[in-house]
């Protein structure tokens, strides 16, 4: 995006598995950013997305349609989507022609949910790399459904996927635990919330897995996976409830810090006006303890806490 000022644009690449809330996040974040005074352009990069709830500035479906690809090449949904992303990678001139008139906007890229696109397939990473050449500074926002915290085996799997995504995508990166307002619906947590957000000593998870006859046979494998995660020590999570302005603001602060966005004085005044009712003059990150008290009922003690009382 070289040429007339402003030469640098900022945005978010919203990624994550199907059902993690990417499209809902784009809707909620776009509304929040507009309330701050930012000009927002939401770009749909998922050719399988239909009936989008937000106003779409650019839609990859105008370039290539998943249904057409599946019919013409006799591919399944996953193979068809990979082909669509490779087709977009080969036709980036089309994407640049769509983005250039939106210079000066803050971009939200709603990306496909196929995990392999973010862990080992090269098309999406190549697209992001080319955007960097256009002076578009993105932060990868990786959404994970918070219900995985209630199952130790699934949480280890999520940690592995998050780590692989961080290493593969090659963008400034934050991980979100989405749908925090629904976490109680999935069962009790084995530990306090900060154990999962900060990814503390994972050996305790192994002890919980050892109580399951099925996973007891895979203890050595789980130990190696946990060791890999702890050796890199890169993964952590920010809790998110997209309906909560305070929660969205914590995420936005992390995103702006990651990609270097510096907001204007006018935006700061808009932020203070918006958040004063809920947060007063305190714009620092809330403690994880406060977040736990907000989203978990006082009677919902962790499994670990109940065991200690016996």
From Swiss-Prot:
Modified residues (N-acetylalanine): 2
Site annotation Stabilizes the phosphate intermediate: residues: 78
InterPro entries: Gpn (IPR004130), Gpn2 (IPR030231), P-loop_NTPase (IPR027417)
Cited SUPFAM superfamilies: P-loop containing nucleoside triphosphate hydrolases
Binding-site positions, GTP: 19-24, 178-181
Keywords on record: Acetylation, GTP-binding, Hydrolase, Nucleotide-binding
Gene Ontology MF, one: GTP binding
Keyword GTP-binding listed: yes
Motif range (Gly-Pro-Asn (GPN)-loop): 76-78
Any Pfam family matching the protein: ATP_bind_1
Keyword Endoplasmic reticulum included in the entry's annotation: no
Function: Small GTPase required for proper localization of RNA polymerase II and III (RNAPII and RNAPIII). May act at an RNAP assembly step prior to nuclear import.
Family the UniProt entry places it in: Belongs to the GPN-loop GTPase family.
Quaternary state and interactors: Heterodimers with GPN1 or GPN3. Binds to RNA polymerase II (RNAPII).
Protein known as: GPN-loop GTPase 2
Species whose genome carries this gene: Homo sapiens
Lineage summary: Eukaryota, Metazoa, Chordata, Craniata, Vertebrata
Gene behind the chain: GPN2
